[in-house]
Amino acid sequence: VQAQPIQPFPPFVELTESRYGPMLYPPRDQYVGRSFKEYGEFSQGELDIFVQILSPGAIVLDIGANIGAHTVPLAQLVGTGGVVVAFEPQPVLHQILCANLVLNSVPNVLTYPMALGNCEGECKIPVFDYSQAHNFGGISMDMVEEGESIPLGKLDSFQLDRVDFIKLDVE
């Protein structure tokens, strides 16, 4: 029996070293993935502003966390005395987000694979072929009749005592 080479990641995920640590990303994503592929980061200008606003111990919501391009640095910024609560409804992006948290040894993030809205239940999102070029973060749940069912929740149901900062990147 001859050994077969092991492919370390699925073909729709690549690994790069960013200024915040190693990050997995979908190289076919036209925005977040493309930015990681070319620069090793995404929207650094936004993160530069967050650094001026946030301090250790802060409670942060990352709504539309995608692969964690902001989640990882936000968690590092607020430190172990703070917490980031991250919401990402797309199952594949949520899995990459969780993998990036593990890769960067980030213990102060709670992730939820769900969308947020004004009611609780389920909604549908489009199903992507991650081997094809697309804006994977640019989905709309408005007029989707077919697709993958995902949980829909209300932020109020989390009964958070306080929130210091909300990063919101949703369609």
Which positions does each model-derived feature cover?
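Phosphate/nucleotide-binding beta-alpha loop and adjacent structural elements of enzyme active sites
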Residues: 1-171
